[in-house]
Design a protein with these regions (language model features):
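Basic, alpha-helical terminal appendages of large translation-related enzymes
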Residues: 7, 12, 70, 75-76, ...
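Conserved, charged catalytic cores of large soluble enzymes
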Residues: 4-8, 30-68, 88, 92-109
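Catalytic adenosine-cofactor/nucleotide-binding cores of aminoacyl-tRNA synthetases and other
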Residues: 1-52, 149-171, 176
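Amphipathic, non-membrane alpha-helical segments in soluble helical-bundle scaffolds
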Residues: 15-30, 47, 51-58, 74-82, ...
Length: 179
């Protein structure tokens, strides 16, 4: 849905995009990862062990944030929204590629599992914040699921910095983010 150049903004189409793409991608990602974290780490966000030499998800998130801000600032809301969806898709790929549900079976892998889960939860926090200007209610629901909140006294762009999800913070009981 683009603006300008006779962009076609239709409420039903927008709702369909939100329900199909975001619910299936972001909702499932949040539910899967927070469930793993609650089960394996006593209902808390795990410590980020930082044992991986390169955090590909962090790098991808930084690029997505830069692209989102550029597109949003230039009124290209469709491209900004695509950056959010792209980050969610790549976060899902990261989770599937790293398979923490298999790694957790070996105790020696616990630090790596903590890092993987932290990275996915942190990426999801950023996804939630990126949605704030577009879908504030959905953004709030996502970050509430992470025990994280948008703080109005801190500039929005400063809250998009990687690593601000607080380790060992409690994860609330899950609720659907999209009805």
């Amino acid at each position: 849905i683009s603006l300008g150049n006779d962009g076609d903004f239709q409420d039903k189409r927008f709702v369909d995009i939100i329900n199909n793409d975001l619910a299936n991608t972001i909702g499932n990602l949040l539910n899967r990862t927070s469930s793993m974290s609650r089960k394996w780490f006593d209902n808390k966000v795990p410590n980020n062990e930082k044992i991986l030499s390169e955090n590909k998800l962090e790098n991808f998130a930084k690029i997505a944030v830069e692209n989102y801000i550029y597109n949003f600032d230039n009124y290209k809301l469709d491209l900004a929204a695509n950056e959010v969806l792209s980050l969610a898709i790549n976060t899902n790929l990261y989770l599937n590629d790293n398979q923490p549900w298999l790694l957790i079976k070996e105790k020696d892998n616990l630090p790596l599992v903590k890092e993987i889960i932290y990275n996915v939860l942190e990426s999801t926090r950023i996804i939630g914040l990126l949605l704030l200007p577009l879908l504030p209610e959905l953004s709030t629901k996502i970050n509430e699921q992470l025990g994280s909140i948008y703080r109005e006294e801190i500039p929005w762009k400063k809250q998009l910095i990687w690593g601000l999800l607080v380790s060992n913070s409690s994860l609330p009981k899950p609720t659907p983010i999209i009805n």
